[in-house]
């Protein structure tokens, strides 16, 4: 499987496609990640709060692949924003790794106002070589502006909810203007967008599945995606998106599905710790 890479603003390269393990039970995670790695996946996205870092690490070890061929992302949970070094140390122990490729602040949790402190912690972790790149997740424009008012280090990545029903045009453009790569979590809208009539019509016409059409829409927007997959068949289907392109008309039609509809929490109000 040949997956394009994107060069981040720190010079590191990230595969534009991978596997996400959000809400994947630990007992299933190792098997799914191992299968994905054996079938060409080279980018795994996990997080401390997912509770499956240890299984991700076991699958990586089991794969026998060179460490530098696998891009591993994990995330700093909200209650550890003032203690990022210890939090990453715990994640690395579970993963069985001496560094991750990308470490993200999972949410800004604005009520607690500690994300700038967390960012300075991530800067130090990058300097120490414990993470190759650093970034944020679920940050809106005002969170990014505040961060850059108080730091000279621009996040390499902003991972946000993006799917056809929540296309996030303004935020993606804002990220791009700052040199920040956009990653999409829930790129299929937790599968709700798969039943959209516009997407189904395009899929039927070009002989692809709705999931493949949506994932290809992300790829052509230069967005990084890592859809969750619940079966080997779905893993293969999701990855089979690099031998076709959507026309400009099809891209515009999918853009038109946008309704500002979230399937996840709003970063303005999400403060769970």
List each language-model region with its residue ranges:
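Alpha-helical scaffolding within the catalytic cores
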Residues: 1-6, 54, 58-61, 87-92, ...
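N-terminal binding-site loop/beta-alpha segment at the start of enzyme catalytic domains
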Residues: 1-70, 189, 273
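Acidic (Asp/Glu)-rich catalytic clusters
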Residues: 8-9, 37, 57-67, 89-98, ...
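Short, acidic/polar
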Residues: 24-37, 80-96, 117, 142-145, ...
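Acidic-and-aromatic substrate-binding clefts and catalytic sites of carbohydrate-active enzymes
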Residues: 24-27, 47-55, 77-83, 110-113, ...
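A structural motif
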Residues: 41, 97-100, 131, 155
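Glycine/small-residue-rich loop that forms an oxyanion/phosphate-binding "nest" at active or ligand-binding sites
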Residues: 75-123
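Beta/alpha (TIM)-barrel catalytic core signal, keyed to glycine-rich beta->alpha loops juxtaposed to Asp/Glu
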Residues: 108-273
